[in-house]
From Swiss-Prot:
The chain crosses the membrane at residues 22-42, 64-84, 115-135, 150-170, 182-202, 220-240, 261-281, 293-313, 351-371, 383-403, 408-428, 433-453. It is found in: Cell inner membrane. It catalyses: K(+)(in) + H(+)(in) = K(+)(out) + H(+)(out). This is Probable potassium transport system protein Kup. It comes from the Bacteria. It comes from Pseudomonas putida (strain ATCC 700007 / DSM 6899 / JCM 31910 / BCRC 17059 / LMG 24140 / F1). The keyword Cell membrane applies. Keywords: Cell inner membrane, Cell membrane, Ion transport, Membrane, Potassium, Potassium transport, Symport, Transmembrane, Transmembrane helix, Transport. One of its GO terms (cellular component) is plasma membrane. It is a multi-pass membrane protein. It holds the Pfam family K_trans_C. The keyword Cell inner membrane applies.
Length: 636
């Protein structure tokens, strides 16, 4: 009986585990694969109608299909699924998480470490550009299908797209927790539809399956030496969204993402591309919109509706990714602090950042109005995608060689292969800068300038504040000689340096002539890892005479809740009773000068960013009625 019972329990647990695995796989399909899953809407259309000079004939179609297939296998299956997904930072992925890993890997090489930070900032900057282009091109390409169903509706494509996109951004502040549960099933339906359409097309012209032979891709370069590399600028559209596999790893883990790719997403994409190719072999004129023309007439309107939902989901994933990237960058010190609003009481990762949301919305609206069609926007798309991919490869190279300690004989050939292919795709997109690709370059350049100015400005600000700082032991010795009047309670002074006296403490002594019975010098340390366990959260050191030094460690995915963290500090003599604790903050006003370190115009830019950044009070969740801010002017 006991055996029967244990078998029953084991079977129940096994079913639960299987159910959870399927649930994670479906959820991953809904969040991770929206972008790459909607690429069939416009990729082959752009290849054959984008002015590349590719003929819609037997050799041209098979050559392009072979290029798309082997690009998917090399870049997504081999590079991202088998290698990049292994470069997790304690389970987290994405540009900032990888940059933090690369910083750790190059800690012993300052110049190389600086290069890794630059690559990370470039990758992050291009991702923000991509976050504007993806919603615009995806929704436009979906709505354009209506023009095939109704005559004379083409002039409504832009207004309808704008309504859909603006509505998407307006609902962000309310969260997408409830409707988010539908994303997975809708995207699974989308991929099943892609596969079914592909099978239907292939059945009409099975010879298209010859494109599985990579020889057709090689032959395309031989026959078309003039456009061979240039066409990669359109082929790369089939890879848009590959970076999402890595960026969303923290939500689902490597295995569900990999399984979803090989079980559902890759087969559906390949079938659909080959189905479109089969249609083009039969009807070259279908190149004007091979995706929608692949569908039977009765299925066109339902397909437009499903495609619109799929592109909205793809856009949602990119917007959420921008919020997540911003939070990580703030914690790592690359972006000024912003107000972060949690939109779910259950899911910590569901956040909303108003400044990012409205900036993205304005960018998307301008793109839709300015370009007017998915074909015109395709030129801008490739630059952002390939640039981000290239930066990811450079960052993971440092991790593989210096952190993982892979043997160079094994790692170098693989990395050279990645860099060669990424370099080809990026080079193919460089000429597109004059055709619309300038947008992500300019947007990325502005964001890089802001992030690098903020990072450098904060470093200089700390250096200026540290100049002439009074060492803490000397200060304690002086008050032993001339003890000030001390009042009951605990004073917490936030400071970047834990071994010197904060300016706020000196100002308090100067103006109020008193000192609290307990004085805590608190330094918040941002780690290059996503989360710090509670038992590693704090370090406490007692100096005597009521002085304590406390270090609080937070990861870039942690909520920096200082009062909650201080409750964990266990020391008999240290009391953090909320109503007896006062927090003293310094509020620096920066004055740009001709001092060495930063040009005057960048100094003014940093001063503007600092003035508009969220202060320590909100960022560290300090109680409003227990905070005193003391101002000081600093020249940089």
């Amino acid at each position: 009986m006991v055996q029967a019972s244990s078998h029953a329990e084991g079977g129940h647990e096994g079913k639960q585990g299987a159910s959870r695995s399927v649930g994670l796989l479906v959820a991953a399909v809904g969040v991770v694969y929206g972008d790459i899953g909607t690429s069939p809407l416009y990729t082959l259309k752009e290849v054959f109608t984008g002015g590349y000079g590719v003929s819609v004939n037997h050799d041209g179609v098979l050559g392009i299909l072979s290029l798309i297939l082997w690009s998917l296998l090399w870049v997504v299956s081999f590079k991202y699924v088998m290698f990049i997904l292994r470069a997790d930072n304690q389970g987290e992925g994405g540009t900032m998480a990888l940059t933090a890993l690369a910083r750790r890997a190059t800690a012993a090489y300052p110049r190389l470490r600086t290069l890794m930070v630059i690559c990370g900032l470039i990758g992050a900057s291009l991702f923000y550009g991509d976050s504007m282009i993806t919603p615009a091109v995806s929704v436009l390409s979906a709505v354009e299908g209506m023009g095939l169903a109704f005559d004379g509706i083409d002039h409504w494509v832009v207004p309808i797209s704008l309504v859909v996109l603006v509505a998407l951004f307006l609902v962000q502040q309310h969260g997408t927790e409830k409707i988010g549960k539908l994303f997975g099933p809708i995207m699974v339906t989308w991929f099943v539809a892609l596969g079914a359409l592909g099978v239907h097309g292939i059945s009409q012209s099975p010879e298209v399956l010859k494109a599985f032979n990579p020889g057709w891709a090689v032959n395309f370069f031989v026959v078309h030496p003039g456009i061979g590399v240039a066409i990669l600028g359109a082929v790369v559209l089939a890879l848009t969204g590959a970076e999402a596999l890595y960026a969303d790893m923290g939500h689902f883990g490597r295995k569900p993402i990999a399984r979803a790719w090989f079980i559902l997403v890759l087969p559906a994409l390949v079938l659909n591309y080959f189905g479109q190719g089969a249609l083009l072999l039969q009807n070259p004129e279908a190149a004007r919109n091979p995706f929608y023309l692949l569908a039977p007439g009765w299925a066109l309107l339902p397909l437009v509706g499903l495609a619109t939902m799929a592109t909205v989901i793809a856009s949602q994933a990119v917007i959420s990714g921008a919020f997540s990237l911003t939070r990580q960058a703030i914690q790592l010190g690359y972006i000024p602090r912003m107000q972060i609003q949690h939109t779910s009481s259950d899911e910590q990762g569901q956040i909303y950042i108003g400044a990012v949301n409205w900036t993205l919305m304005v960018g998307v609206v301008l793109l839709v109005i300015g370009f007017g069609s998915s074909g015109a926007l395709a030129a801008a798309y490739g630059v952002a995608v390939t640039g981000t991919m290239l930066m990811t490869t450079i960052l993971v190279s440092a991790v593989m060689l210096l952190l993982w300690k892979w043997p160079p004989l094994l790692a170098v050939p693989i990395l050279v292969g990645f860099l060669f292919v990424d370099g080809l795709f990026f080079a193919a997109n460089v000429p597109k800068i004059v055709q619309g690709g300038a947008f992500p370059v300019l947007a990325g350049g502005v964001l890089y300038l802001l992030m690098s100015t903020w990072k450098r400005g904060k470093q200089i600000l700390v250096e200026r504040i540290d100049e002439g700082a009074l060492p803490l032991p000397l200060f304690i010795s002086s008050i032993r000689i001339q003890p000030p009047h001390r009042v009951e309670g605990t004073a917490v002074f936030l400071t970047a340096r834990s071994d010197a006296v904060p300016h706020a403490l000196l100002h308090n002594m100067l103006h109020n002539q008193v000192l609290h019975s307990q004085v805590v010098l608190l330094t918040v340390v941002s780690e290059d890892r996503p989360r710090v366990p509670e038992h590693e959260r704090f370090e406490v050191e007692a100096y005597g005479d009521g002085f304590f030094r406390v270090l609080l460690h937070f990861g870039f995915m942690d909520e920096p809740d200082v009062p909650a963290a201080l409750k964990l500090c266990h020391l008999d003599d240290l009391d953090f009773t909320p109503m007896r604790t006062t927090y003293f903050l310094s509020r620096e006003t920066v004055i740009a000068s001709r001092l060495e370190g930063m040009s005057r115009w960048r100094g003014n830019l940093f001063a503007f960013l600092l003035k508009n950044a969220n202060g320590n009070l909100r960022f560290f969740n300090l109680p409003l009625n227990r905070v005193i801010e003391l101002g000081t002017q600093v020249e940089i």
